[in-house]
Amino acid sequence: MEIALQAINLTKKYSDKVVAVDKLNLEIGKGEIFGLLGPNGAGKTTTGGMLTTRILPSSGSAYIGGIDVVKHPAEVKHEIGVVPQTNTLDRSLSVEQNLYFHGRYFGFSRSDSKMRTEDLLRQFRLSERADAPVMALSGGMAQRLMLARAVFHSPTVLILDEPTSGLDPQSRLALWDVLGELHSRGQTILLTTHYMEEADHLCQRLAIMDHGKILALGTPNQLKSNLGSGSTLWVEANRDSSTYIEKLQSQDLLSTKYSLRATGKGVTIIGNAITEIISTVTRTIESQGLSIVSLKVEEPTLETVFISLTGRDLRE
């Protein structure tokens, strides 16, 4: 596998007590879509900041296209395309001008920049809005324009920080299609996200991060099948879960082999051979004079993997 991006013991400390990224090791192959999945504060954005030269690492090293990110930041900027969380389009320019002047900034001639701009407007389905001010774009269109700008100079690696955050479901799906098209053209993509379905749908491999560390790495299917995260049993009674979760936790079978979490009136139980404990769960709840309102079993998801690794979900 030809390596497009490599991080070796990459670390960022803001103080002795605040370690944003802790000895991160990572290799991303050329043409791969790789995801960093984790909650806010996991270290994803800081990792992206170091890889894009915006944040100086405290220690460790990183290479993009074989170029040292710390020693040669100016050269690295020609190897990366970046789409940050915030809208960084020039509001004083039109859609077309945002692309054209980006090309000029990267050394394209007037004619080459104009030609590349026209190609990207077609590719990203923005031709009809070429003369529109960027302020008139919807969130999805603005994100497509930032993507088009980021790949203008054909970067080795495209780095996206929470690319669909704040988009409506339709715009999110449309952006997934655009990223899929870029990948089909051989573009290497690193994206950070806290959306499990996004990581599952887009990423060939992903790393689950929390508190600045990589907890697990693999394909989505590998993570779901190899980490022993098990299936999920969700049960809801006719009263708040606080009235019966302690009783469930007092059962030796449940407390030693399964992860239990209260979720409003329901309880989520994660573990292997989940169907074997259904009778124990229902009997325990009913012994408290309660009745079962809902019960369902679900196969492993990236969320259950994360919960099994951290004891909490991505939204906490």
Language model region names:
Residues 2-5, 12-197, 201-210, 216:
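ABC transporter nucleotide-binding domains
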Residues 81, 107, 125, 146, ...:
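A generic structural signal for secondary-structure junctions
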Residues 273-316:
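C-terminal coupling/interaction segments
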